[in-house]
Amino acid sequence: MRIGVVGLGKAFMLMLPTFLMDRRVQLVAASDTDPLSLRQFKADFPAAAVHGDIESLCKNPDVEVVYIGTPHQFHAVHAEIALNAGKHVLVEKPMAVTLEDCCRMNACAQRAGKYLIVGHSHSFDHPISRAKELIDSGRYGRVRFIHSMNYTDFLYRPRRAEELNTDLGGGVVFNQASHQLDVIRLLAQGRVVDVSSYLGRWDAARRTEGAYSALIKFDNGVAANVTYSGYAHYNSDEVMGWVNELGEKQPERRLFPTRLRLDEVLNKGSEAAYKNEMSYGRGWSAHGLPKMARNHQHFGHLVISCEGADIVPKAEKIEVFANGEYHCENFSMPDFPRQEVMDELFDAISGTRPPVHTGEWAMETLDLCIALLEGGKPELIGMRATAVACAGRSSGR
């Protein structure tokens, strides 16, 4: 797969190990507004082309797939440019910040006959796929209830101003619920019919959502409760064996150091400037990547309650507590991080298997994120997406 990268920011930096280790992938082009990032890309990939804008990148005949890792508010326009140029698109979550944007993106994909896949999301993770396989086997009866929780330091990592502005896709709902709700939807296998939510906005200096809790009901009778906090107090990696979200083993750390580090940054200057200093082409390159994690990625503690068992996926194993019996299946080390994303993209393009994480799928996840932000008005669930639905219903061929 010949990939052109649009946006050389943090999302790209997290995907870079995947691109480098997947033999099916060739990075052939990049575009960004930062000349230092483009210079670093050219140094890391001498045979690749660099472009000052997405329009010129999409005219490059070597580009087969466009990976979009730009800020959330630009996802829609960048995806439309790429799709209209006849490129397949892999766009980071959230797909966009409005349902109308999602609608236009899906319509472009259908007209172009190209695939629009949204990821990385933690619903791609192997432990989640394995849990779904156990559910689908019917061995433990139907899913009845799902519990998901994650306590992190998300809100106190250095941020640009837009990342603390909900209207521009900032805050933990657009950034983190888009992971958590994707996982819940994949496992529940129903359509959401009711949501009750509570939002936490507890820091006047960071005036966006830092936490949420919600009860979600599906049309097949499944109920799920989800809780997330990014306020950098309790670290729920404790219940994941001190394996962090990226699958890296961490020292036992009862308290996050993130708030203290942010105070140090703010005392010296701008957190946006500090974050920029750690970006690709400044603090990062393809030759200075950390060692590969030895576990699968995860998104916190998850319990799937079926009629005959509780299923608990973790980063290194999956546990089943079934009517007095305990089963444990250890996972082998992943070949490379986020392999599942590239497998789905490759299988779609090659015609091997239709994708799961299409634009339509991601649009429904965004609909649920918006429901959380609006307080879960039950009469709106599923109706917003219908009201702005595209004439076409397929994200690609």
Curated annotation (Swiss-Prot):
Family annotation (Pfam families): GFO_IDH_MocA, GFO_IDH_MocA_C3
Top-level taxon: Bacteria
Keyword Transferase appears in the UniProt entry: no
EC top class, as a word: oxidoreductase
Gene Ontology terms: biological process: catabolic process
Keywords attached to this entry: Aromatic hydrocarbons catabolism, Oxidoreductase
EC number: 1.-.-.-
Keyword Oxidoreductase among UniProt keywords: yes
GO molecular function: nucleotide binding; oxidoreductase activity
PANTHER family per record: BCDNA.GH03377 (PTHR43818:SF11)
Family listed: To P.putida PHT4.
Protein name: 1-carboxy-3-chloro-3,4-dihydroxycyclo hexa-1,5-diene dehydrogenase
